[in-house]
Amino acid sequence: MIPAIQRIHHVAYRCRDAKETVAWYERVMGMRYTTAFAEDTVPSTGEHDPYMHVFLDCGGGNVLAFFELPNQPEMGRDPNTPAWVQHLAFEVADEAALHAAKAHLEAEGIDVLGPTYHGIFRSIYFFDPNGHRLELACNIGTAAQRVELAALAPVMLEEWSRTKRAPRHAEWLHKEPEAVAPLR
């Protein structure tokens, strides 16, 4: 068995321009640029493919990294996956922080979707300059709701696996608070 994973070390995505990406994440997201690797040869494969690999501190020991690959074809999206599926979500402290973040992003000229209610958290969505969808989320759920969802998770996955239709066991998740039925 694999030893216990301690945490995610970093998450890496491709970018169009490393300098522009670092500047955007520092200015817009308040992240700190910490490290850069640049090589002409990929250490793991030995391939000749020059790259710049930049790392940003997201806070809480979390690291976001990007690769600029100037010799590769222009980056694109997976044409078979909707844009809303692949995204990176960051947590903010509370709803006030979420609303402040939305105002900040809009002041930067960034289109923001939301806040969207997800039962146990609220989110806003937007894109970085590379086309990566980002989410800022704040937790609003109760301990009882998290316990209920944990108990339902195996049942829901099994039902989905059999039917490929959304199970209704936790449909309260996307109803606004005044419409949410009491917990069982």
Question: Where do the protein language model's features map onto the residues?
Answer:
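Short, extreme N-terminal leader segments that mark the start of a protein/domain
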Residues: 1-16
